[in-house]
């Protein structure tokens, strides 16, 4: 309908003087150059003859015009198509509304314009509104195009595929003393996994419940030489290797302590004996009491090396769940009691932090080859797999189990279910046959910057 409007040949330079400063809405200036505001003004003045039809026509035209402009219809419907009556009504009654409505949309230099020109510009106001929104549409389109990239980057903050028991076990096994307080467990998890830096109250409740309701975790009270708040948590010495070869994705079996009553009786005997006992010595005393027939005759600090070592050894050799419930006498024939010197040595190693880093654990649990001491009274038979790691080279050997960054292991979008051995998110893993280490061991650049100590150990 724009072709029906007669454009007279007035010079557009008269209106260009009003646009000396840069325009906020460049589309209005383009309309000024293309349509010619003088032509619109003269057309509006020429339409004054059509107002002779009476005020009813003008009011109808003004109402029609206001409804069009208020509804945000296209300017061709609002300013062009209704005809002379509607245009006159716009120039008369809707002119003031056009001036008021165009205030925030147009340059302030348009204020000296007459009512008719302001009304004509009011008819063009929807152009400015639509064009001012067009950059927003463009930005929205660009942001939608960028969304997949940001979503892909957020995979490093995805929820790790480990259970809370696995996370607690990781934290305890990497600590030098094999025991941590509750706050230290929280901090270790948040340092290693960015996902757990939010919604802390939820998952920390789950961590506390896992510590309380699983027999594989033991609460160790603070000793006088370690003042502070909160007790320590450690792994049960009889729980064995719950995670095969350091794979923390799934436990082999749930550790269930079936001798709670025997533990209480052993605790009473230990308190009456007057000597300190290790957290795991009570269970071994109960097993020794069943084997010998009298738990009260066993000294409080005395452990039978067979009773404490045989469940873990049998479990590592592929023993089934019935080995935990069976008495110690059913596993192997009884062996002679240890000498007092060996008892003191075992109690010292079980109670305190490691003082002999040169003593090696069993050979098939470590990638490095060391001499294995298979003597029945050696330190290997007196300690479980968790405590044996006290005597490994913490500061002189390379990391045996370095946890790997998600984005380097998982190779998204494959997810956690990728069939590669690196989906376990662990470093080198060796089995009993002495296979070569996984080639993913050297790539630990992400989390080593966060946590400089050895992050994970297989034993």
Swiss-Prot record:
Residue ranges, compositional bias (Polar residues): 295-311
In-chain residues carrying the UniProt-annotated modification Phosphothreonine: 156, 302
Record PTM text: Phosphorylation on Thr-156 abolishes binding to target promoters and subsequent transcription activation upon insulin stimulation.
Region of interest (Transactivation domain 1), ranges: 14-93
CDD domains: FH_FOXA2
Sequence motif Nuclear localization signal, location on chain: 106-113
A single GO BP: response to interleukin-6
Modified residues (Phosphoserine): 212, 284, 304, 307-308, 310, 438, 459
Region (Transactivation domain 2): 362-459
SUPFAM superfamilies in the record: Winged helix' DNA-binding domain
Keywords associated with the record: Activator, Chromatin regulator, Cytoplasm, Developmental protein, DNA-binding, Nucleus, Phosphoprotein, Transcription, Transcription regulation
Pfam families, per database record: Forkhead, Forkhead_N, HNF_C
Annotated DNA-binding residue span(s): 159-252
Chief localization: nucleus
Summary of subunit composition and partner proteins: Binds DNA as a monomer. Binds TLE1. Interacts with FOXA1 and FOXA3. Interacts with PRKDC. Interacts with AKT1. Interacts with TET1; this interaction may recruit TET1 to specific genomic loci to mediate their demethylation.
Role description: Transcription factor that is involved in embryonic development, establishment of tissue-specific gene expression and regulation of gene expression in differentiated tissues. Is thought to act as a 'pioneer' factor opening the compacted chromatin for other proteins through interactions with nucleosomal core histones and thereby replacing linker histones at target enhancer and/or promoter sites. Binds DNA with the consensus sequence 5'-[AC]A[AT]T[AG]TT[GT][AG][CT]T[CT]-3'. In embryonic development is required for notochord formation.
Protein known as: Hepatocyte nuclear factor 3-beta
Gene coding for it: Foxa2
């Amino acid at each position: 309908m724009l072709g029906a409007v007669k454009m007279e040949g007035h010079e557009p330079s008269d209106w260009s003087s009003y646009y000396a400063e840069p325009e906020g809405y460049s589309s209005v200036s383009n309309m000024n150059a293309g349509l010619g505001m003088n032509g619109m003004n003269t057309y509006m003045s020429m339409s004054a003859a059509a107002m002779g039809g009476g005020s009813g026509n003008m009011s109808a035209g003004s109402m029609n015009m206001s409804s069009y402009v208020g509804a945000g219809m296209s300017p061709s419907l609002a300013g062009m198509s209704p005809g002379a009556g509607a245009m006159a009504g716009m120039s008369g009654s809707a002119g003031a509304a056009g001036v008021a409505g165009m205030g925030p949309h147009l340059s302030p230099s348009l204020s000296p314009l007459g009512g008719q020109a302001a009304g004509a510009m009011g008819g063009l106001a929807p152009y400015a509104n639509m064009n001012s929104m067009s950059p927003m549409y463009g930005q929205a389109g660009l942001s939608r195009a960028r969304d997949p990239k940001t979503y892909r980057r957020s995979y490093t903050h995805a929820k790790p595929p480990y259970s809370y028991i696995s996370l607690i076990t990781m934290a305890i096994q990497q600590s030098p003393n094999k025991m941590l307080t509750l706050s230290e467990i929280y901090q270790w998890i948040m340092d290693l996994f960015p996902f757990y830096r939010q919604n802390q109250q939820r998952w920390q409740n789950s961590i506390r419940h896992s510590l309380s309701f699983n027999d594989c975790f033991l609460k160790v009270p603070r000793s006088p030489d370690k003042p502070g708040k909160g007790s320590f948590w450690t792994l049960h010495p009889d729980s064995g290797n719950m995670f095969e070869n350091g794979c923390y994705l799934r436990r082999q079996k749930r550790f269930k302590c079936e001798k709670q009553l025997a533990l209480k009786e052993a605790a009473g005997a230990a308190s009456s004996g007057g000597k300190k006992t290790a957290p795991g010595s009570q269970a071994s005393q109960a097993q020794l009491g069943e084997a010998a027939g009298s738990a009260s005759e066993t000294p409080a600090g005395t452990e039978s090396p067979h009773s404490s070592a045989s469940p873990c050894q049998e479990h590592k050799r592929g023993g089934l769940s019935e080995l935990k419930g069976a008495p110690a006498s059913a596993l192997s024939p009884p062996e002679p009691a240890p000498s007092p010197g060996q008892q003191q040595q075992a109690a010292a190693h079980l109670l305190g932090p490691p003082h002999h880093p040169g003593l090696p654990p069993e050979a098939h649990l470590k990638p490095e080859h060391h001499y294995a001491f298979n003597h029945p009274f050696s330190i290997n038979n007196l300690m479980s797999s968790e405590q044996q790691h006290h005597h490994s080279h913490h500061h002189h050997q390379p990391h045996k189990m370095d946890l790997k960054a998600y984005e380097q292991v998982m190779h998204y979008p494959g997810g956690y279910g990728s069939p590669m051995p690196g989906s376990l998110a662990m470093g080198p893993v060796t089995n009993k046959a002495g296979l070569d280490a996984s080639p993913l061991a050297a790539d630990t650049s992400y989390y080593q910057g966060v946590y400089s100590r050895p992050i994970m150990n297989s034993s």
